[in-house]
Amino acid sequence: LRKVPADEIKNRVMHILDLVELTGMEARMTNQLSGGQQQRVALARALVIEPSVLLFDEPLSNLDAKLRVSMRTEIRRIQQEVGITAVYVTHDQSEAMALSDNIIVMNKGVVAQMGTPQEIYYHPVSEFVADFIGEANFLKGTMDCLDGDHAVLRVEGHPARVPAKEGMEPGKEYTVVLRPESAALRDEGGLPCTVALSCFMGSYQNYHVTVGNTLVKLTDYNPKNKRVYQVGESCSLAFDPESVHIL
């Protein structure tokens, strides 16, 4: 139907099989391939016709977690090697971050934000976007005053320094977006809190703490030789003012 000469068809097929690392498996039936190999066959079929744009509609949703990570790495490698424009539809935030040069976050059919993965993650325009891309804590605070390039907010009755943004006014309420990896627990010097969950996960320690009536999630990487806070302990929630985003 595409009127491609037989020799060119063969050359394209062999090139694409090599690209998706399926050389030597040309004669195998579908039921003789693993889940990951079947995904590569589907990708090869799409690439061999040399489309100008390739649409992926949640292609990894039926694979197990480890295979998903492996396949998204392969898809990114192949996309960059071929140089094709790809539109990748997914509800998996980690896939979106790992595969994209630019991300469009949709909310009920409307574009909520468009930008690079870094822009979306570090500078979300709304709570919806912040919560959709990665985990996020939201601390409500009323502005006390400006302090140079920073503002002082009252969070659950306690002062917290955050980056000042244009148009901030004393007495108005703002939302602090705090990522779990940007927060830390200290004996003192931060927002008073109480540990609600302390869970060792191998390479990191998960904490849930309550700051007043607000639950905050923290991820403490490389916990070896660090103090581990236990459930019920009182301590302080600390963060670098430059690591948070204000809405």
Where are these regions (language model features)?
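Glycine-centered flexibility sites
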Residues: 24, 35-36, 109, 115, ...
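ABC ATPase nucleotide-binding domains
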Residues: 1-128
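ABC transporter nucleotide-binding domain
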Residues: 116-148
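Non-catalytic connector elements of ABC transporters
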Residues: 136, 146-247
